[in-house]
């Protein structure tokens, strides 16, 4: 928490911790627990006498992995990929710590199928599909076809979205207002086995909050409390481009926006051709360097 508030230790509370559910799937079993712990915290280096309690939901999964392992690749910090750590114990005198790249094993016969929550409204589904289509254009150029496939939750009674080994895009009915994505990875190789993407109910809250103070002076669409669904869908498409990138093993690339100069970001010709950042893995959602009058000239916002 910015270095001011630090968790020193946690003491599990067995009386208020319990097993919530146990599920069996085709190739794995999952146990979900509600775990409560008392925290010892320090504020600016001083240990507090208060011990607040924290309750979290923890899912533990045992999966049957394929005997055929994907070839590993050593991670390099100069390349924008995700990674997992490993320790090589084969040398008894000196252990070796290293990092594997996290990546998908994508072929024309092995697409990446995402099952999307049927609670997500149709306009948002179209925005998400647009993001998948943008990625598929790249794969088509590589001769892999269109490997990212979006399907609605199956109506079959055997389908369960909480299966940790399938790719899902879920509608999150919580206080979060950001799109989230996390991968389930084969720790032996770094192969990404599945991805869970969450689309929050309160996405409009984030769009409005960031849009008002970054874009209200430039774009009249943000000068209202109720943001138009069209604007939310544009924002969702940009967020999902990054989420799909994370699901493929790419890392956040905050240097993407540093590649363009302020002059370029105010140029209609440049922004229409190259967009507002050099990487979809950036966190930039708005062209907040634009000035009043730039939109009318054709600058992409």
Where are these regions (language model features)?
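Solvent-exposed, acidic/flexible segments
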Residues: 121-128, 132, 229-237, 274
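Active-site recognition of the HExxH zinc-binding catalytic motif
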Residues: 133-136, 190, 234, 238-253
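Loop/turn elements at helix/coil->beta-strand transitions in domains of secreted/extracellular proteins
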Residues: 110-112, 144-146, 191-192, 276-278
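Flexible loop/turn segments at secondary-structure boundaries
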Residues: 121-124, 156-159, 177-178, 201-207, ...
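Zn2+-dependent metallopeptidase catalytic core
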Residues: 119-147
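Short, well-structured beta-strand/strand-turn elements
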Residues: 138-156, 253-254
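Conserved catalytic/binding loops enriched for acidic/polar residues
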Residues: 256-301
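Auxiliary tRNA-acceptor-end handling modules of aminoacyl-tRNA synthetases
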Residues: 1-120, 138, 153-206, 211-228, ...
